[in-house]
Every structure is written in C-alpha cells, then in structure tokens.
C-alpha cells in the first residue's frame, strides 16, 4: 500500500474531524466543512454503520493521523498487545514516541508529514547522532535537535514560532533558541490530544 499523497483536507472530511494533517497557519474549519463527506453527494447520509465499520473507521483515522501504513500499524498493535497494561493506551504511546511525531510535537515541523520529511532528509539528530528513520522510537531523556545546516530553514523557524504560541505538550521540553528539545517521558493517555477511541481498535483486532 502506497502512502497517500492526495488532498489532506479530504481525509479529515472523510473522518468528520480534524486529523491535523494541515499546517496550523489556517484553521481547517475555514478551508472545508468537516461535517460533510467528500464528493458530490457528501451530504447524503447512508445506512447505519455496523460495529465492524465503526471500528474499521477508527483504525483508519488513527493510521491517517500518524501517517502509518497497514503493515506498520499491525506491528505496533502486536507490540502493544504483547506488553503489560492497557493495550489501546500502549498503542497510542508507541505512535506518539515515533521520531517523526516527536519532531512534530516539539514544533520543528508544522505537520507530521513535514516532520517526517525533516527526518528523512537528515535534518534531525537524536542525542547528537543523525537520525533518518521516522519510525525510530524515542526514549525518555533523549535529546532531539535540528542540525546546524537546517536551522535557517524558514519552514522550521515558522513552525517553531507557531508551536510556541499554541503551547507544547508537557512531556517535551524545548529550547527554541538552540532548536532542540528533550523527550521527558512517554505521555500518559490524558496527555495525548485528539478525538481517538482506541478501544474500538482493540475490539477490531480482537475479533
């Protein structure tokens, strides 16, 4: 399955909620109507969605939020299921600990896709070592930074400025002047923003 490269707003409309796939420079609600599905007949309501359909939609939504493909997502779920604790919460923690997501949460990229590109283009270091694998798991205490040669990129400066205005998660500490941040701890469920019902995903894979 190839990575989706079409209109990002269309995906958010399909899920009926902002998936934060677009930059925060302009509210997605100003760009499109989230309460109507994409397409000519988007306003027409269909038949009642089955339990399976609801669970599948939730999985698709989370995959799109984090930019993860099906095979990767299955691996994350298997790992979450293997660990002790709440499987759904652990799944989200694994996704939040991805390097591309941490770069996004620290404000170095205006979207996860942009953050993923920064990682792939070797603009990011973890503990002083260049990292270019977006799925790399970041651990508590790791220092994530922008490489010197990338610090003057306008998109990074602008993204960081917007992130500072909007506030950053409590589980990261960012020094904007140094273009670096510390992953303080794996976020608790209450710290993970987003309209996500992870229990539906657990139910789907438990079938």
Swiss-Prot record:
One Pfam family, short name: Ribosomal_S4
GO molecular function, one term: structural constituent of ribosome
CDD domains: S4 (cd00165)
Entry keyword Transcription regulation: no
Protein known as: Small ribosomal subunit protein uS4
Summary of subunit composition and partner proteins: Part of the 30S ribosomal subunit. Contacts protein S5. The interaction surface between S4 and S5 is involved in control of translational fidelity.
NCBIfam families documented for this protein: PRK05327.1, rpsD_bact
Keywords assigned by UniProt, alphabetized: Ribonucleoprotein, Ribosomal protein, RNA-binding, rRNA-binding
SMART domains named in the record: Ribosomal_S4 (SM01390), S4 (SM00363)
Protein's gene: rpsD
GO cellular component: small ribosomal subunit
Function: One of the primary rRNA binding proteins, it binds directly to 16S rRNA where it nucleates assembly of the body of the 30S subunit.
Membership in a protein family: Belongs to the universal ribosomal protein uS4 family.
Positions of the S4 RNA-binding domain: 97-160
One GO process term, biological-process aspect: ribosomal small subunit biogenesis
